[in-house]
């Protein structure tokens, strides 16, 4: 049965009274679990940004590359994270890099697609001026494309962060270890419904904070 709001609130107070306790690898406070999940998200998302943003620029800039890569993106983009995770486990032989790989491959596509669309929508007049001035490809990318593409790029980054946080919860449920996803699954095995409800709110709040942080960066 579902716990009452009062019982859930009492469980939350008790849970957050000591969020960083450590009684061994399989019994750590919710604070540690959130931090471990955020660390994996940071690594997977960071690698996705390092690959996805330059790739998006190249796809948007060169029509031939766009025609070559677009079908592959359309093929891979809809694949569920739960399908990518076994591939990661097979290749890396460990849960942590497999989870990071899953975040990488699932969160890269919004950045690639939005960056490419932004580059394609840069006014042709800007590029004509660049050709007249005989600007190098690097100067075109940094002085013309990047400022014009920035709104699209930031939208892609926001979508990717949301995807990364969504994926890590599912991945950790299957891989185990320390992380908010594993913590939820462990509480389910213990039939601790109060903690599961609390985790739902925690996952939502952390996702909201990540998005607000990116909005703050975008305004600057």
Which residues are covered by each model-predicted region?
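Alpha-helical membrane-interface segments at transmembrane helix boundaries
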Residues: 31-43, 66, 73-76, 92-93, ...
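Short cytoplasmic-facing helical segments at TM-TM junctions of multi-pass membrane proteins
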Residues: 110-156, 184
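Generic hydrophobic transmembrane alpha-helix motif, especially the helices
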Residues: 74-110, 117-118
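Transmembrane-helix boundary motif in ABC transporter permease subunits
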Residues: 43-73
